[in-house]
């Protein structure tokens, strides 16, 4: 969910197509976070980790576009790695969404 919040901050600081693209990316991350919360039965509970506040990366908050891109690329790379690590633990038949999410995050990181 940190990635969703980070992209929302970036969307708020951009105009036009940049704002739309960042908002779309935020929505993707928020939807995945919701799906995970529901799949693990923590949605709406006191155990839902999305209830926490996040320390956003300094580069994202600096207003420097290059620093924000570096921080967002790092977040996306860490997500790609986390999704890939979960593939090995996933039950057969449930790996495809993890692979899709990992590849998507890796592409997003590379595009930054």
Regions found by a protein language model. Name each.
Residues 1-112:
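All-alpha RGS (Regulator of G-protein Signaling) helical domain and cognate RGS-like helical scaffolds
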């Amino acid at each position: 969910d940190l990635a969703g919040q980070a992209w929302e901050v970036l969307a708020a600081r951009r105009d036009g197509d940049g704002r739309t693209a960042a908002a779309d990316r935020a929505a993707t991350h928020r939807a995945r976070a919701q799906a995970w919360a529901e799949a693990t039965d923590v949605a709406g509970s006191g155990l839902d980790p999305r209830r926490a506040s996040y320390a956003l990366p300094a580069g994202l908050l600096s207003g420097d576009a290059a620093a924000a891109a570096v921080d967002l690329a790092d977040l996306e790379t860490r997500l790609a790695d986390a999704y890939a690590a979960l593939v090995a633990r996933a039950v057969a038949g449930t790996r495809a969404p993890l692979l899709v999410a990992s590849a998507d995050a890796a592409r997003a990181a590379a595009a930054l």
